[in-house]
Amino acid sequence: MNQDEQKRAAAHAAIQHIPAGCIVGVGTGSTANYFIDALAGIRSRIDGAVASSEATARRLSAHGIEVMDLNNVDELPLYVDGADEITPHLHMIKGGGGALTREKIVAAVAKKFICIADQSKLVDVLGKFPLPVEVIPMARGHVAREIVRLGGQPMLRQGFTTDNGNVILDVHALQILNPIELETELNQITGIVTNGLFARRPADLLLLGDEGGIRTIAI
């Protein structure tokens, strides 16, 4: 299978994990889009979905899936999303699509987080993919200086504004040996909304598409 076929296979595999009558949290990005397309086939079996971005909400609605406000949802059994990088410990870098803050909120609420990905996303050490950091616009310079102090090379994502009205700094040159520690340290910098490390709340299950089919990794 090529990369797109692996993404599609992982997305379809996640459908088997959705309980009937539940509300599903849905991520953002190319792999999540395959999941949304697959979810449309069982929309009569679910009560609705919580979207992690405006783009995801539009795609869900286009498929006739009810999009629900997270504030009106008492329980979220499942969240399904992709990753830009993921380790065997199921720590991730996410946010390549710029939806990291809402993704992190939905993941925090969900009882179970299933990551769907193609085999290229599985890495031993996080950091080859630039780490997205969502920043309040007026704090951009301050945050960039603090990130340099930590050894990173921040670059403003040009022409991009998040759904929350903020900017993204993509941080290069980080070899993230302790993702939990770095996630915590970055979030203590004033002006950072959140960063794209999902280590304090990792995935519970990885459905990984590769040439041979689907590999399942759990913690």
From Swiss-Prot:
Pathway: Carbohydrate degradation; pentose phosphate pathway; D-ribose 5-phosphate from D-ribulose 5-phosphate (non-oxidative stage): step 1/1. GO terms for cellular component: cytosol. Substrate binds at residues 28-31, 81-84, 94-97, 121. It comes from the Bacteria. It holds the Pfam family Rib_5-P_isom_A. Transmembrane segments: none annotated. Catalyzes the reversible conversion of ribose-5-phosphate to ribulose 5-phosphate. This is Ribose-5-phosphate isomerase A. It comes from Nitrosospira multiformis (strain ATCC 25196 / NCIMB 11849 / C 71). The lineage of its organism: Bacteria, Pseudomonadati, Pseudomonadota, Betaproteobacteria, Nitrosomonadales.
